């Protein structure tokens, strides 16, 4: 199964009394993208925008949380906002071609709007407001909101173009923030040294861990899946055959050949 955590949990519960059924769940994520020491802010901003807003944020691997070193916060956020302001949102065959299209339906757009307003009313600070140009259609603009000061952040997958931003002081705090979720699908580090990435890779809790790459677009030649509420096995990618089938042991000889050497009268 590939889909939301709630649906995956319901499927798992339904099949709990059926040990003959293999249940491989690839569910959603509250995915972190950490931007660390890098002078390449334009490239970092492009990775952030691709991760958060491609497909209008409707990918299980989309970045939901941007974790930024405080010393580079202003410069990076300015770059990301400038790029996000240029995004064209429209129908697939519009001209010029859009970067992102609509949400799946109006109900999804309504839910995302309510979620953004909730974050605002509970201590979030809007960096880029969520805008719905036509209330009768499910098109939403990319949105960014700083939630550093929120006392309690909902640990849910906001399946759309809302990016929550968090400031941190050091890499230990960044990794702690990245792991502050029940999910564990994908995490990316942008910038930093090879030593920083080795530390990030070893300590972050996710099934897919990237360096200087977007959170989206996992290589399906490798295992694809997560931990926690993101899933239990790897139903897609390289290990799909292991988790979506069962192994069969077989012993063979060209001809039947046997003899009983002891214990006979």
Task: Please provide the spans of the model-predicted regions.
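ALDH superfamily catalytic-core signature
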Residues: 5-149, 211, 259-260
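Conserved C-terminal structural/oligomerization subdomain of aldehyde/semialdehyde dehydrogenase
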Residues: 34, 117, 132, 139-265
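Periplasmic-binding protein-like
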Residues: 1-2
């Amino acid at each position: 199964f590939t889909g939301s955590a709630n649906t995956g949990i319901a499927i798992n519960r339904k099949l709990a009394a059926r040990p003959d059924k293999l249940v491989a769940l690839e569910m959603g994520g509250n995915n972190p993208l950490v931007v660390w020491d890098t002078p390449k802010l334009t490239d970092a901003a492009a990775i952030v925008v691709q991760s958060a807003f491609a497909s209008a944020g409707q990918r299980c691997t989309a970045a939901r949380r941007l974790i930024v070193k405080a010393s580079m916060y202003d410069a990076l956020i300015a770059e990301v906002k400038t790029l996000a302001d240029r995004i064209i949102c429209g129908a697939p065959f519009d001209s010029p071609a859009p970067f992102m299209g609509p949400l799946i339906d109006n109900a999804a757009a309504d839910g995302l709007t309510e979620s953004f307003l909730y974050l605002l009313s509970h201590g979030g600070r809007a960096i880029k407001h969520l805008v719905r140009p036509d209330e009768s259609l499910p098109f939403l603009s990319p949105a960014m909101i700083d939630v550093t000061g929120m006392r309690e952040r909902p640990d849910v997958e906001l399946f759309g173009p809302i990016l929550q931003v968090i400031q941190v002081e050091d890499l230990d705090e960044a990794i702690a923030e990245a792991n502050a979720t029940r999910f564990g699908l994908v995490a990316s580090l942008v910038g930093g040294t090879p030593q920083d990435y080795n530390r990030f890779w070893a300590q972050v809790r996710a099934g897919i861990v990237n360096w200087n790459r977007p959170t989206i677009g996992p290589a399906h030649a490798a295992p694809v899946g997560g931990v926690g509420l993101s899933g239990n096995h790897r139903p897609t990618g390289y290990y799909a055959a292991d988790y979506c089938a069962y192994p069969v042991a077989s012993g063979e000889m060209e001809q039947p050949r046997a003899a009983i050497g002891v214990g006979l009268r």
